[in-house]
Amino acid sequence: MIETYSQPSPRSVAAGPPVSMKIFMYLLTVFLITQMIGSALFAAYLHRRLDKIEDERNLHEDFVFIKTIQRCKQGEGSLSLLNCEEIRSQFEDLVKGIMQSKEVKKKEKSFEMHKGDQDPQIAAHVISEASSKTASVLQWAPKGYYTLSTNLVTLENGRQLAVKRQGIYYIYAQVTFCSNRDAAGQAPFIASLCLRSPSGSERILLRAANTHSSSKPCGQQSIHLGGVFELQPGASVFVNVTDPSQVSHGTGFTSFGLLKL
């Protein structure tokens, strides 16, 4: 007996979506995106258009209001006296409000200008300190007859006055010295007012000299320096002398200061 076997047929593979469906979905997506962009642009245009229409309507109302005022002034009969009085009252209130607003702005501007002019007064005055008889840069006492009007000027290292605000300053110094040396054989006593810039460079602003006295006991002599200079923030000024051992440090003899103009 012969048995026969039949080969089972292979399963069919499921086919993917047809090409037409893919094209349809692609076109639908493009259409939706285009519609969204178009809707956004149209909304922006509509918003701007409505704003423009609103402005035009306001201008038209203002024009009608002005024409009505002119008609009331000319006394045309189409408007009653009551309406004209009401319109005049509205116009007067409008003008009064504008004038008050201008007056307030003017006062605020004047106050700001006045406030800007009221910069803090910057001033300093210090007297000498006999802590060093050898340093050519004079030392100034941090206490006693000592004035610093604000923290915008400081005494740094006891030697120099430093400013923190740019401006025009009057700077002065008085140096009193005592000398009884032979005047013929000695160089004059020289005092210099010097500037140190924020970058660290130094230069002489003012310089004065006086000859020695041969009188005994020694005669007190004073050198006065003073001038107007523009200082930058971080700049400092100091006093230099040729012979610090001859400087007199009594009260009021030797002093140094500045004032912002």
UniProtKB/Swiss-Prot annotation:
Q: Which Pfam families match?
A: TNF
**Segment forming the signal sequence:** none
For side Cytoplasmic, which residue ranges?
A: 1-22
- Note the topology in the membrane: Single-pass type II membrane protein
Which InterPro entries does the UniProt record give?
CD40L (IPR003263), TNF_CS (IPR021184), TNF_dom (IPR006052), Tumour_necrosis_fac-like_dom (IPR008983)
The record ties this protein, via PROSITE patterns, to: THD_1 (PS00251), THD_2 (PS50049)
Disulphide bridges, residue numbers: 178-218
Q: Which UniProt keywords apply?
A: Cell membrane, Cytokine, Disulfide bond, Glycoprotein, Membrane, Secreted, Signal-anchor, Transmembrane, Transmembrane helix
Which positions does UniProt annotate with glycan attachment?
240
Q: Give the main location.
A: membrane
Provide the family line: Belongs to the tumor necrosis factor family.
| Summary of the function given for this chain in its UniProt record | Cytokine that acts as a ligand to CD40/TNFRSF5. Costimulates T-cell proliferation and cytokine production. Its cross-linking on T-cells generates a costimulatory signal which enhances the production of IL4 and IL10 in conjunction with the TCR/CD3 ligation and CD28 costimulation. Induces the activation of NF-kappa-B. Induces the activation of kinases MAPK8 and PAK2 in T-cells. Mediates B-cell proliferation in the absence of co-stimulus as well as IgE production in the presence of IL4. Involved in immunoglobulin class switching.
Q: What is this protein called?
A: CD40 ligand
